[in-house]
Amino acid sequence: MSSQLTVIIAGIVLVVAIVVALVIMRRGDSRFTYDTQHGTTPRATEGEGNTAVTAFKGRFSILTTGVGAMFAALAVKLWGMQMVSSDYYEKQANSNQTRTVTTSAVRGRILDRNGVALVQNRPSLAVVAYRDLAEDEVLVRHLANVLGMPYVAVLRNIQDNTEGAQSLHTIATDVRRSTVAYIQEHAGEFPGVKIAERTERQYPYGETACHILGYTGTITSEQLEAQNKKTSGDDDASAGKITYQSGDIVGQAGVESYYENLLQGIRGEQTVKVDASGNVTGQAGAVPAKAGSDIKLTLDLKIQQACETALASAIELAKTTGYSNAGNGAVVCLDPNNGEILGMASQPKFDPSVFIGGVSNDVWTELNDDKGSHPLLNRAISGQYMSASTIKPLSALAGLEFGTYTSTQTTNCTGYWTGLGKAWGKRCWLTSGHGTMTLQSGIANSCDPVFYDMGKAFFYDEQHSEGLQEVFRRWGLGKTCGIDLPSEGAGRIPDAEWKESYFTDASAEDRKWNAGDMTNIAIGQGDILVTPLQMACAYMGLANGGKQYVPHVFLSAVSRDGDGDAYKYNGKGKKKRLEAKINSDSDLALVRNGMHDVIYTASTSLAAHFGTLTPQVYGKSGTGEKSGEDEYAWFCAYAPADDPKYVIATVLEQGGGGSDTAMHVVRDVLGVIYDEPDTSSASGDSSVR
């Protein structure tokens, strides 16, 4: 063994040194002269001859004793190495002949609620090498040319210190088979370079559900530091946990990012025997990697595809009916009984496969162009818009609760409202006027003056001057819904405090909250902002009597090494987010009746389209106005009215009137769910906004 040999050599060197020292000392103590006057007997040069001999013998005895002690210690050490610590030194010797490398784990799949794979894995090849390859600049440059990568990038990957000096460092992933073949055929040109089998993400349905699923990419230095802090430790506390290395593939958006801790597997280890040149000569042991868990989502692929198809069709309809700027939009379909997201689409979409192996600069720039449509933005949860008239059912509940508009109160709509004085008059969307309107008919016909009267009453009610905002917030507006996806928007419910702090460049007078501000938010205009998901959650409450469950896309996680569900959403499948206070059953009934009339009474077009569906649908249209842009089309609804199972909320940016274009999204999705396609050819009559 090398350690024993070292000790023996050291002992021999020590003995030789001592012998040399003795010879020198012997020579020094035996220097004699001849006395010519008294014969030829030699005499010591210093002192008497007996004294010199005695001194020499004393020093020799001391050295002999020292040498004996050293040999005794050496013998004890050799005995200990051979008999007591032989296992330790054997392991040390073996470690110099082996290398331990980490092995990657397969990432978990993402499935729909019925087990259909939305994201799966495919085999791929990676180029790997040991760190000492970095010392050969010519080889590194040659490898960079073959891989089509910058020299500095290849060198950086080889020198990376997060994978350990003896680990194989990932240089390139998802390498073309032609490139791999070249490296293998010219192995002599690439000593120390290996080909490793890996897996890459595969999307069987292309762009479907791209905003929910998200995408993966190489871990960034910031992510690497943050992730490994979670599993760092000085003992075995982190054993069996996920650890990350430079070059690892992690979730960067959507479910891939939010549930990274479930999808990511636990890497394994493989110990290989190597020769003096570092070439692998055999296997010495392995700890297998543990695959990540499969995640089952609440999505129903059939409904998801229906949402995407319906949204794209409605946008095309808007373009062909005078709204050429249409192109973006979103739709959410959820279960009002538990908050499960059944379908969610955002337009435009993107192809998540472009991120495999690293996205090019040109593609990344296109996806993030400030002047473009931002395909990576999930408008269903991050897009923030004026709610338009879809908020009027909530305004009605607020008016009924605080008495600012009663069930028997009426408003005479002439098409122009002057409740705040002629100088601050406001138009109704129907400039010819609706005539006498009650609160229920005001909802059905989306009559603006009814809600102007309500907003004015709130403003001048000293006790409940912000009662309208209170109700909006109670129904979940102005704050995130808590969905398990990144980057959810909170929206905005404006009030006096917000206006004072927001318009800092305006005069003190202009920063004051006024009656006009209140009348604006009563009809969903002005500075109010909501997301499609927030409106879907609000209509969830309208459908089930005020209860709102946390919207979520996660259903369960299934360990691929186990035999069942590893984790289910909240244990029982639903978690209440809030329960909006409803003043009375009669108030809710009035609002629901108004939503019924929106579809079946006030609009002949809506009645024609929805009348061919077996279940009754209650809903509300909306048409948002934004300066310098075309109108934004909204439609929110739930069905069946007597036993709600589906809530759908949709918005089309610059897509026209809600009852003209957006309503088709809701109708088409329900048509797929109930297998009752829309057979009506009736065009929008714009009788409801």
What do these predicted regions represent?
Residues 1-359, 467-474, 656-689:
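Periplasmic/cell-envelope proteins involved in peptidoglycan metabolism and beta-lactam response
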Residues 273-286, 299, 329, 336-390, ...:
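Beta-lactam-recognizing serine transpeptidase/beta-lactamase-like catalytic domain environment
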